[in-house]
């Protein structure tokens, strides 16, 4: 790495030295795309709801040990005293009322119900143009954002054509959306309500409103339904971090020597804090890292490895709980 760091981007590109594992990661089948779920999520949804998210044409591609904890704990900004309000369960349409009645107000409870309700989607719907063996009620928001977090389910971003230029999507956690001001890795929608409405009107159907109408798009009512869903999402808190003080810095009395060295690098030589500013480690902006400086454009398993454009600065608070990393899952570990 030190040898590479001494070379210019032009030298690395001309000599073909950019590590292949750091190129954009393709979808499990990039030509086909669409939502694909880890098997552990498929099995649990089938057990609780008798709804099958299996695709007949392809399977999820990353090994379970690279994926987030499942089911993930759920923390609320309004009730930090309760700890994990999911009680170790996957929250679904079948158990949400039992778990949250008396904790949420009626508006928030209705928002959670909508986030857990399956609505028609491109690959999972009731028409014969689908990728499930049997007609499907569809996909819920929390099928990807399980327990308000992420299970690393993937899809292709719907905002680019042709197909090779579409990015694989890393499902981001919904923890801490209350401190964020941009939503979507590149579309830069300005509120979580905008993104909630956009997902079902457009992203659920690859940005094609004609197909959306054919397959039964669920048009959410902005003044109540979208508002309720957004309010619940804004309650989802980051997990506890007992070694950090209120300003987001390590408490020297609790942190290890190695962690303190890491913090020194974070604010110093590695220059991470220039974009990932404490206490939540985001500047709420977008940046173009121009990684394409280091390699020539090439087709890799169906995805065109070329310029990515500006990408949102995602918060690093709680980052250990949401592997894999970067906007397209190309980095499987924090070390990567």
How would you describe each model-predicted region?
Residues 1-336:
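Periplasmic c-type cytochrome electron-transfer domains
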């Amino acid at each position: 790495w030190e040898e590479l760091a001494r070379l210019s981007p032009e030298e690395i590109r001309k000599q073909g030295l950019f590590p292949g594992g750091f190129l954009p990661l393709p979808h499990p089948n990039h030509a086909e795309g669409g939502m694909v779920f880890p098997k552990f999520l498929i099995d649990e949804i089938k057990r609780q709801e008798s709804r099958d998210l299996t695709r007949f044409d392809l399977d999820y591609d990353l090994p379970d040990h690279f994926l987030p904890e499942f089911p993930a704990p759920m923390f609320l900004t309004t009730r930090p005293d309760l700890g994990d309000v999911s009680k170790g369960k996957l929250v679904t349409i079948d158990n949400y009322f039992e778990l949250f009645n008396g904790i949420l107000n009626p508006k928030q409870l209705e928002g959670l119900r909508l986030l857990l309700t399956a609505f028609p989607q491109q690959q999972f719907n009731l028409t014969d143009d689908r990728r499930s063996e049997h007609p499907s009620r569809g996909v819920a928001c929390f099928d990807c954002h399980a327990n308000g977090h992420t299970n690393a389910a993937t899809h292709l971003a719907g905002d680019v054509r042709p197909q090779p230029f579409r990015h694989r999507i890393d499902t981001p956690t919904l923890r801490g959306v209350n401190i964020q001001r941009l939503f979507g890795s590149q579309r830069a929608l300005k509120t979580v309500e905008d993104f909630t409405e956009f997902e079902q009107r457009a992203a659920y159907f690859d940005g094609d409103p004609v197909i959306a109408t054919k397959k039964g798009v669920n048009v959410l009512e902005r003044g109540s339904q979208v508002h309720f869903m957004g309010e619940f999402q804004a309650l989802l808190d980051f997990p506890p971090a007992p070694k950090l003080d209120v300003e987001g810095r390590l408490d020297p009395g609790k942190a290890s020597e190695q962690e303190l060295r890491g913090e020194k690098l974070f604010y110093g030589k590695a220059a991470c804090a220039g974009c990932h500013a404490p206490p939540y480690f985001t500047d709420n902006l977008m940046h173009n890292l121009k990684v394409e400086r280091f390699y020539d454009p090439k087709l890799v398993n169906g995805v065109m490895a070329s310029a990515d454009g500006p990408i949102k600065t995602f918060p690093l608070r709680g980052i250990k709980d949401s592997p894999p990393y970067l906007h397209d899952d190309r980095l499987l570990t924090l070390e990567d």
